[in-house]
Amino acid sequence: MSARRLARLEWRDYCNRVSKQLEGQKAELEVVGLDLGDHVEARWIPLYGLVYEPEGDIFEIALEGIDHLIAHPTDLLVEETLRGLVTIEVIAADDTHQILRLREPLPLPVPLR
């Protein structure tokens, strides 16, 4: 199992596509950074969705009661297993890692060829 890095041009479409399926899924959000240490910002609460706005270069993770914004993200990584999507990681310009874990893997559609 390894994370796959998405090209920046894919971010908006990917977020739009998976957000429809993610809505209501239980998720945990962990933030890891040199200045912050390692802490869990949200523990197994409903996820509303993911948004990337290229105009402002802002990535948003919307959870119940939390609107987590990441300014100037540099990388978006997704971890997928045979059961589906399990983790989404957003790395900010200051090298802070936002790690979103899904309680249950999200089944993904078979890619068209």
Segments and roles (model prediction):
Residues 46-87:
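Amphipathic protein-protein interaction modules
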Residues 72-113:
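Helix-rich interaction surfaces within compact, conserved domain-sized segments
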Residues 23-32:
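A short, Trp-centered hydrophobic/proline-enriched beta-strand micro-motif
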Residues 36-46:
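Short coil-to-beta-strand transition motifs
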Residues 2-23:
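N-terminal leader/targeting segments and the immediate start of mature chains
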Residues 30, 62-64, 100:
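Extended, low-complexity, amphipathic alpha-helical coiled-coil/linker regions that act as scaffolds
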Residues 1, 29, 112-113:
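Mixed-charge (acidic/basic) macromolecular-recognition segments
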